[in-house]
Amino acid sequence: MSDNSKTRVVVGMSGGVDSSVTALLLKEQGYDVIGIFMKNWDDTDENGVCTATEDYKDVVAVADQIGIPYYSVNFEKEYWDRVFEYFLAEYRAGRTPNPDVMCNKEIKFKAFLDYAMTLGADYVATGHYARVVRDEDGTVHMLRGVDNGKDQTYFLSQLSQEQLQKTMFPLGHLEKPEVRKLAEEAGLSTAKKKDSTGICFIGEKNFKNFLSNYLPAQPGRMMTVDGRDMGEHAGLMYYTIGQRGGLGIGGQHGGDNAPWFVVGKDLSKNILYVGQGFYHDSLMSTSLEASQVHFTRDMPEEFTLECTAKFRYRQPDSKVTVHVKGDKAEVIFAEPQRAITPGQAVVFYDGEECLGGGLIDNAYRDGQVCQYI
């Protein structure tokens, strides 16, 4: 039996129940555990309360309860430079970014991992719902978490083999109710704490108000694809492909009473295109182009892959053929897909294994580019 006490694991602790139980399990398994709270954003709310301060109090309470040392480290500059600037640049380009994917790649498994190594860590661990399996030759495979509704491999798809080699996901074999039960049984102060939702630096704030603090809104015309003027939009950055709510045109009808959806954008003319019907023709595509394509283990420079893919979180897998060349890929769908959104992640799977992914640049309908940016 191996002596885990000689293995140091540094746990990223957010003050939530998942990372609390992660630290608890590793401590119970005999590892040398250190808890680290990452302050990535100055998130004082409208009442003057810094939610990070409240979260850190929870980390301190849990660390004291389970008997591990803890530290707080400030990654605000790294987060601003590597995640938030990217987030703003994507919106300026008419795309819809996924900051969680970039945060995992650049902060939790780069800045944090690097910091953990200075503390003598053998591994880092987080409360993500994913699994890592190690081959005899040392190769690490990332598998979906067993809790289908909580699986977070979509957000971890940009991690490298080197990052995964140093990573543990102790919750990957558990379902969320089991995690809460373990926290309650151990009397952890975070056992009943509500899960955080949404983009970490926006939290409960109004998204439009938040974004307008950093990017000037540029109102423009809202049009149907056949040229009918539907009024004014508030700024292209506030809308995403396939969006239904927030258009302000619910009472206007075309040929039928079907609801209206965002079906396209023209950044150069500042036009937002809308159409009626969930499966409007303009929302459907047959392939996409992706860049920043990356796999969790070594792959040839150029190859073709038959696998499944997700184009957004919690979406069922779809069969695809992927033609990879360097860090770019053409992804051809077995069945047409709805609302493929530039800026979002496309993530590839082989059964339970997450193979990697990329960022969507363009969607195509029978070889013609969709007007999504």
UniProtKB/Swiss-Prot annotation:
EC number(s) recorded for this UniProt protein: 2.8.1.13
GO annotation, cellular component aspect: cytoplasm
Active-site residues, as the UniProt record annotates them: 103, 200
Disulfide bonds: 103-200
Catalytic activity: S-sulfanyl-L-cysteinyl-[protein] + uridine(34) in tRNA + AH2 + ATP = 2-thiouridine(34) in tRNA + L-cysteinyl-[protein] + A + AMP + diphosphate + H(+)
Matching Pfam families: tRNA_Me_trans, tRNA_Me_trans_C, tRNA_Me_trans_M
Annotated GO MF terms: ATP binding; tRNA binding; tRNA-uridine 2-sulfurtransferase activity
Renumbered residue ranges of the record's region Interaction with tRNA: 150-152, 312-313
Primary subcellular site in the record, as a coarse category: cytoplasm
Keywords recorded for this protein, A-Z: ATP-binding, Cytoplasm, Disulfide bond, Nucleotide-binding, RNA-binding, Transferase, tRNA processing, tRNA-binding
Binding residues for ATP: 12-19, 38, 127
Site description Interaction with tRNA, residues in chain: 128, 344
InterPro entries in the record: MnmA-like, MnmA-like_C, MnmA-like_central, MnmA-like_central_sf, Rossmann-like_a/b/a_fold
Gene Ontology biological process terms in this record: tRNA wobble position uridine thiolation
Region annotation (Interaction with target base in tRNA) ranges: 98-100
Record localization: Cytoplasm
Stated role: Catalyzes the 2-thiolation of uridine at the wobble position (U34) of tRNA, leading to the formation of s(2)U34.
Similarity comment: family membership: Belongs to the MnmA/TRMU family.
Protein name, as recorded: tRNA-specific 2-thiouridylase MnmA
